């Protein structure tokens, strides 16, 4: 028998341990001890919760808004957290991140994930999306084994409606698969993951980048090196998803020699040579639809309009008959207006929840832009797509730098693209030019097939989403376009380029992705610094939002803010991207300052040596002539690239220029078939080739008094894939020669070229920034010859 411990008191009473514990509990109830509550992890104005999933970029966390009052119900969001140090190591990942951000800004559809805002701190980049509580569609089919025909028909109609809306906006997803689809709480389909999204045009939608996932990618992306129709590739992926809904497994999954599908070459050879088979429980009507969609030949494959008219989708005919522009107008009315508090000039944003967020702006908040809530007001600036555009391999975008320095940039498109030139004066004289463009579009009489305008809300930092507005109405409100202004700083774009060597999982297969082409317009992210006290501070120099300068006299900085001239996702206000402490700024010197130093140096040399010299004129020193052969078919996409130097120079410089001018670059798009036939299916990622440009010819000293002039013709080759076409000059600078660096080519580009910009985000090479930043130092090093001559005569006079 166990004894109970006892303790005698002075009063003679016996108190046991049980009584003592009961007294302690009573004391805790009567006199509670306030312990320190556990602090929640926060990211900007959101409280971070559990992990919803983990993908290629990082973890997706559940978040909810901070309640400002007891009656307020927090709103749940999904925050995709991306470590910034991982972006520095992988340039492809950076492209996909900014592509997704800029594409989601322009999509307002119930079956497409909605972008709330974009946040950033010193460690993470957070993409705040709406929370879809139904889970992944892939796991949903696994639980159900297969879907009933009625349920599959409803979900497939929602998928077709969302994809048709994207195509109407001029965007293609190119990575539709079960893993990129979600379900909401009402089991409605939601399309996500826009990392491979790209822009196309009605007149020419051919693309050359092989991307997507095995089994979901169309055969023309894999077995052929020719350009493919982007919309037909999305149609194929929709057919594979429909087959998986009805059958419970993917089509062409019965190859016994390749059961796992790791051998991509054998898989697509089996797809192209084997007829489609169906399980017995699939009825004839959906079989007919699948036989029309899953056709290896894209010319025989039906389009989305034919799919919507199919008899199997007749129960959802009313839903599919809704025009895409209706979703923009309808969802804009449903969104509550954001509270108009605070200073309008401050580049702050508002949240999309029911709360007013009056306190979040005063906290250490990283709120950047709430693209969800936009109220409809008179547009200030909008652009529309021309009906019959001209083709060009390159286009120019004119920006406004933080130092008001103008630079010029060539954007090599992944495909031939339509473009329209918009030039605006910083004094607000661009109204007449916009009206001329709008009048030119309306005079053609052709109906625009897609909406291409972002309109700016007066008195608000946010922008309204695109909607179908006639050009005549848009020009009525251009007069107020000079009212909106915002502050900006340089945004550090990481240019550490390399191709990932580790083999990714089969569901994220993207071997042909590269980093140039039409993505240079994605550096359009204004920045507000985060002060030392943790509060957001505005930039000092306000710059007009619509101050688009002349392209003849200006050049572009890699870190400036781009204003897209037109296109299906053209916009006047990009995603506001706050800058974090510890980031690097590249203070590029303007090319004009470098040229001024060269002129002073040459003038000084000529005065010392007694030679007549002419100052270097940036417009006459070099002339770039960009020529392009019209691309009417997939085979006519090879353009020769030559460098010619015509002028009076030394024999060495002539020999070097002749040697450089004979190099011809031929680049073909990557083919999965060629890769796996050579590597036996051992790797799923391949390094994209990068063509290295040659340094420009040297303009040497001419003691005979003749002026050095060179006409340089550059014919750029149209890339077969998205590989870089950035020249990388690596030459020694002699004291007797003055080298013309690569950025000087952009200054005298043909002003007659039309302007076009893409919605996609791209990264620029670090070498180009280092060239611009080091030009001033190189010029100072070149002054040694004149200085030596001057010092020589000084010393000689002192001897006497």
Curated annotation (Swiss-Prot):
SUPFAM superfamilies found in the cross-reference section: Protein kinase-like (PK-like)
Pfam families named among the record's database cross-references: Pkinase
Annotated GO CC locations: cell cortex; cellular bud neck; spindle pole body
CDD domains hit by this protein: STKc_Kin4
Domain of life: Eukaryota
Enzyme class: transferase
Domain Protein kinase per the UniProt entry, residue ranges: 46-313
EC numbers on record: 2.7.11.1
Positions of the catalytic residues: 175
Modification sites for Phosphoserine: 365, 388, 521, 748
Keywords annotated in UniProt: ATP-binding, Kinase, Nucleotide-binding, Phosphoprotein, Serine/threonine-protein kinase, Transferase
GO biological processes: mitotic spindle orientation checkpoint signaling; peroxisome inheritance; protein localization to spindle pole body; vacuole inheritance
Bias-annotated ranges (Low complexity): 348-358
Cysteine pairings via disulfide bonds: none
Molecular function GO terms recorded: ATP binding; protein kinase activity; protein serine kinase activity; protein serine/threonine kinase activity
Function statement: This protein is probably a serine/threonine protein kinase.
Family: Belongs to the protein kinase superfamily. Ser/Thr protein kinase family.
Protein name per its UniProtKB record: Serine/threonine-protein kinase KIN4
Species whose genome carries this gene: Saccharomyces cerevisiae (strain ATCC 204508 / S288c) (Baker's yeast)
